[in-house]
Amino acid sequence: MSFTHDLKLPTYDDLKCPVVNVSSPALRAGSFHLAKYCDLQFKEFMLCRQEEQDPRKCLNEGKDVSLCAIDFFRKVRDTCNDTFTTFWTCLDNARDGEMSFNYCKEEQKAFELCAKNKMNLERPEPGYFSMVRMHDSKRPVPSDPFRIGSLERHPPKLDV
């Protein structure tokens, strides 16, 4: 791919964003609850990436995802730190480094109970993220209709 002088690259200030500084086991341990807690931000970011077809136009949505994840893990630290630490430590020490939930059911249950009682956040049921769920975005529809085909975000109403 060639670049021209017309190409506008983001500045370092545009790219500056706090880092979600958690380990892989901690991220895996909180993944289900994080996905539900930051569902709106994740959907906005993925919709932007799909519609714009240019990651530079979605930097703010990406920052929102990072900030939401940081907020989630801070709340977990403040409310359920002991059960969460026990859970991710179990995942980290699971055999052969596979971080399987199968070996940590008791720790997982304790964390999920704490998240439900203290954070009012239930783990989504299996299949929740594969269900079709509508998202009403406040972002304007992109102006280039040749990028992704139809720009209708909602299916038309059926006359029955």
Segments predicted by a language model, with ranges:
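Mitochondrial intermembrane space
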Residues: 1-160
